Amino acid sequence: VFDMYRIGIGPSSSHTVGPMRAGRNFISLLRNKHLFPEVEDIKVRLMGSLAATGIGHATDSAVLLGLMGKSPSVIDVDSIPGWIQDIKEKDRLLLDSCKPIPFHYSTDLTFEPSVLDPYHTNTLIITAFDDKGKELLTRKYYSVGGGFIETEEEAKLKQEPRALPATEEDKKALPYPFSTANELMEQCRKHGLSMEAVIRANEEVIRSREVIDDSLDHIWSVMSMCIDRGLNAKGC
């Protein structure tokens, strides 16, 4: 349920949320590999569809916000214009919101719409360098839809793009596993359960009933807030 109904900024899950998650994931990798203190330069390449429609979908801003450590589910949308303006005017990126590094938007972030990866058209590469220009870490990401991302390494293990779980917890064994609508209906028939009961039982393996109910209430609250925000906003 929380892979299908997830809170994130727009206008696109594949071109905005996914790239932001990629940037945030890259920061986590730098920290996990103890490379973060050495980073003095970051390069971002947007390719294929991410580049072709990147400006309209704010893909460029999304990646930078992810590199700042921002999460698409809790980001303060009113602060985004100021953060991006600060990057462009000061030629500086606040990595993970704590480490300032030089960043020239016009040269350190490139749009390459003609570069098409055979695995998926929504492709980006992020590379980190030290103060001597030595490459510290590079990762190719695919934004495969719905806000899901895959690394190049993960993609090599698959025959075709497939969305990964949003969290490691989602990989736990489920009492009523299914991957298609037909399999879901078969679980219902086999165990004499409603569709709602099957879904609820699977969810409660991952999270408590209280957490599920509170999270669903929060999602509805954000939906309502988005409606109100849209109705009260001015301009195109």
Question: Where do the PLM segments sit?
Answer:
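Electropositive phosphate-/nucleotide-binding environments in soluble metabolic enzymes
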Residues: T16-M20, H57, D213, D217-S221
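Short, hydrophobic/aliphatic alpha-helical segments
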Residues: V1-G8, K43-L46
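Hydrophobic alpha-helical scaffolding
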Residues: S12-T16, S49-T53, R209, D213
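N-terminal glycine-rich anion-binding loops that anchor highly charged ligand groups
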Residues: F2, H34-E38
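Intrinsically disordered, low-complexity, positively charged segments
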Residues: R21-N32
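A structural-propensity feature for long, helix-poor, extended segments
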Residues: P37-D76, I80-L93
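Conserved phosphate/anionic-ligand binding catalytic regions in large, soluble enzymes, centered on
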Residues: Y5-G23, G56
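C-terminal regulatory domains involved in ligand/effector binding and gene-expression control
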Residues: P72-C236
